[in-house]
């Protein structure tokens, strides 16, 4: 083998840093760049756009009817929605390929009044799922600022929102 490659592969040292730089540049968004966005069908067949909620915090929660932890947090999301409607919106994204009527009936049984949209079980660019439930927090400017895998409750969401608003206020 030494006759074919008498010296170590010459690009080995430069490939690593170049690849790292390429990956870092790919993840950097220019100043003023918008975060993730989606337009998905709601339970009433009307499109729901994340961009329509700009100016408020948005709690984006991915869930499924078969997910026990998801069902445990639904009343908490509803409580948060009722308490913080002017300050923050909640959008539930059902991550299953079920008929809208099934999800509509399910949401009605749970007394959910926040918007529920249907992903058809397809991933949504900008929202990386590693399991269910997963909750994302989107800033009033439309930037993804937090991700939580596992259940959340109204107190957790309120505390996180207070913390982010306090931090944002101190930066001004």
Task: Give residue spans per PLM region.
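N-terminal secretory signal peptides that target proteins for export/translocation
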Residues: 1-11
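Thiol-/selenol-based redox modules, centered on thioredoxin-like
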Residues: 137-172
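Short pre-active-site segment immediately N-terminal to redox-active cysteine/selenocysteine motifs
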Residues: 56-58, 62-66, 131
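Short, internal strand/loop/helix patches
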Residues: 104-141
